[in-house]
Amino acid sequence: MLHFSKLKYLYKFLLIFFVSNIINAQNYYLYVASESDDTVSLLKFDGKHIEEKERISVGIYPTEIEGPHGITIDPNGKYWYLTLAHGNPYGKLLKYSTQTNEVIDETTLGLFPVSM
């Protein structure tokens, strides 16, 4: 059994939580959270190749790693949500637009919010 505590030493820890067929049956898009550098990558997979379409900076404090963890998208595909597990002192839930990949709302959560 793999425990997340054993993965804390990895340089980049990727969480892939969502695959969406946005344009057509041959193109799939994934939001991938990178805990150790406070980014989320939007990847495109066409069945053969994976391409990073955009790297989204999700950190709030420039000198602190906030650690993006939980990531999901709403059923209509209009918004995606991300938890930042580390904070000052609590983590946050951020709401993004899938059209612009910009934050449109946020709320403070308790200590170390990881999954949704």
For each feature predicted by the language model, list its residue ranges.
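Predominantly soluble domains enriched in secretory-pathway, periplasmic, or organellar proteins
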Residues: 25-116
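Sec-dependent signal peptide recognition
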Residues: 6-16
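N-terminal signal peptide c-region/cleavage motif recognized by signal peptidases
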Residues: 19-20
